């Protein structure tokens, strides 16, 4: 299976190339200035977007407004805001889509599968029967580690 390409949309941010001068520059980050049609809600620290390539109906992203690549570079206030927005997004998805469960995921760094280097948390609604056997969840990232319940080793 080939990886899907990441949609990139230029946005305008400001850079300070020399003391006191502010110049607009193009940013290829799709989360810094997202398509307004994808923004579900936001506050000063985070925005919640519908995913551009949804895994399932209701797939949502929680994104810090500040451009930061790693969750571990976010401030405590941003981390708190991400968790609060995740809970609110879940309430909204529950109302609209009525899923049977959720996967919450964060790929931090290219080695972990992060393709857009702006921190974002996935809220992926799951539905009974969407996979024949959903056990293992995120463990399927490394297939040889996934079916731990079938192994004899401790």
Protein language model annotation of sequence segments:
Residues 2, 8-154:
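HIT superfamily nucleotide-processing domains
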């Amino acid at each position: 299976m080939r990886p899907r390409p990441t949609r990139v949309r230029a946005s305008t941010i400001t850079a300070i190339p020399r003391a006191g001068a502010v110049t607009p520059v193009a940013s290829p980050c799709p989360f810094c200035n997202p398509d307004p049609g994808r923004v579900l809600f936001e506050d000063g620290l985070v925005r919640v977007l519908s995913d551009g390539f949804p895994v399932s109906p209701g797939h949502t992203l929680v994104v810090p407004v500040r451009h930061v690549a790693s969750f571990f570079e976010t401030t405590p206030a941003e981390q708190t805001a991400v968790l609060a927005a995740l809970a609110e997004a879940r309430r909204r998805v529950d109302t609209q889509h009525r899923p049977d469960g959720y996967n919450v995921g964060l790929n931090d760094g290219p080695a972990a599968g992060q393709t857009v280097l702006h921190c974002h948390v996935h809220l992926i609604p799951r539905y009974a029967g969407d996979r024949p056997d959903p056990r293992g969840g995120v463990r399927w990232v490394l297939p040889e580690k996934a079916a731990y319940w079938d192994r004899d080793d401790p």
